[in-house]
Amino acid sequence: MRRPPGDGDSTGEGPGNWGLWGAQESRRLCCVGPDRCGQALLQIGINMMALPGGRHLDSVPLQEQRLHFMQVDSVQRWMEDLKLMTECECMCVLQAKPISLEEDTQGDLILAGGPGPGDPLQLLLKRGWVISTELRRIGQKLAQDRWARVHSMSVRLTCHARSMVSEYSTISRTASQEMGQAEKLLMEKCSELSAVTERCLQVENEHVLKSMKACVSETLSLLGEHFGQLLELALTREVQALVRKIDTSDNIYITESTTGNLFGLTQEGAPLCRIIAKEGGVVALFKVCRQDSFRCLYPQALRTLASICCVEEGVHQLEKVDGILCLADILTDESHSEATRAEAAAVVAQVTSPHLSFTQHLTSFLENMEEIVTALIKLCQEASSGEVFLLASAALANITFFDKMACEMLLQLNAIRVLLEACGDKQRVDTPYTRDQIVTILANMSVLEQCGSDIIQENGVQLIMGMLSEKPRSGTPAEVAACERVQQKAAVTLARLCRDPDVAQEAVRLSCMSRLIELCRSPSERNSSDAVLVACLAALRRLAGVCPEGLQDSDFQQLVQPRLVDSFLLCSNMEESFV
């Protein structure tokens, strides 16, 4: 199931998502040394991704008649076994795992299954990953004063850098003076690092070695800066070529292939998205979305735009080319396929994300908000799959944070009825991620006084009560977190709605107080979430003000009467009884 863009969930990057050298708070590399060294490595950090390598060889069982070899030298036994082996991967394994007395859990890095001929982007990404990983590991070994390892890794780093420069020069289109200068500076620093680490091997005086360590850190820092500059220059040139091809091509197959390549680059992280935005990627993609001859490419182009707009530069470019107006036109034009409108909803969800501060000043969005909200409600109502509903509801949820007028529009458009009806349709609402979007909309709409009567009319209190019992099916961290958000927002919605006495009486009739007490007292019911606990305590206190007779004395004295912080501390320290 696709996750909504701009949803704010913190998910770990999968093995297919490895970013670039940009300074990202959540992707800092572990490098110990002077500040400049750490900063340089931070600037070139690439997320770890296991490159496809050789598979582990299964151990070959020994026959009983060969048990005597167990007492023989291990090398001799290996030589005997080698006669019977026909595995073609043995040499690969030997190359990847050098014989060494030094324990190193990661071993040496090799490029397995390297980029094909004429594929400069993959070459840059793979070589870039290897080099930045080597830089990080050199920093770690330097902090441990493992000088022999630092020197050997520095030599290997020089080889990787030379290979990247040589291979890219072979397949790149044209050479530039700026690129040549960056390559020269990088190789000079690589040679300097190898030379200074070699001298360190011959020094025994600790005081001299300590001063030389600072010199190595400085060199490593500068090397990282030069590598980052070279990689950015090379990637910028390749992105320019892709954008130019999209912008000038009138061939649907070339445009489709190039747009797909651009989308692949957006999955490599925010730094590449910034490069794409700066080099006109947003402008070129909206040009595709405005040509009827490319209608079949709209979903792919919009999906790429949603990825680019995770960075500030992408959103600014979108506003410059009247992207919001284009999205509104696509969403309101029913001649477009459902897939196209769903991808347009994904872009809207991204650019209205409440977690991105730079999206809060889109004046063009306010001008088109009514049309967009109306189209999104209709898309939710007519969605043929859970993914389409998820994208449309995620956009609506983010819009309710974006502007207060959106909640009033949703109320007038009978959004509560549409959303609550969808909750009973397993084809549209089948995951906690989707219910998270629905309850977010309800929580934000519940600040309106008129909302309570609509909720009761559509049997909404019972559905909200059901959300208080949301449980993960798979147990994955992302799904567990989504369930916690559903429980928390359901409790918040209930607390807000219970200002209306009719809603409060309905909640008491449906035994909401019992469920709230259970969530407060039983950590496992709320996955030990403090956010859920606070929301449930607030909702329980609101209900107790309307119907105090629904509480036992012990519950009232522990959960309602004390200050909220005291009740919170009491419940958060509770140990469950398994008797």
From Swiss-Prot:
InterPro entries linked: ARM-like (IPR011989), ARM-type_fold (IPR016024), Armadillo (IPR000225), Insc_C (IPR045789), INSC_LBD (IPR031938), INSC_LBD_sf (IPR038205), Inscuteable (IPR039921)
Effect caused by changing residue 78 to E: Abolishes interaction with GPSM2
This protein's name: Protein inscuteable homolog
CDD domains per UniProt: INSC_LBD
Higher taxonomy: Eukaryota, Metazoa, Chordata, Craniata, Vertebrata
GO biological process, alphabetically ordered: asymmetric cell division; cell differentiation; nervous system development
Organism: Mus musculus (Mouse)
Expression by tissue: Expressed in brain, kidney, liver, testis and skin.
The keyword Isomerase is annotated on this UniProt entry: no
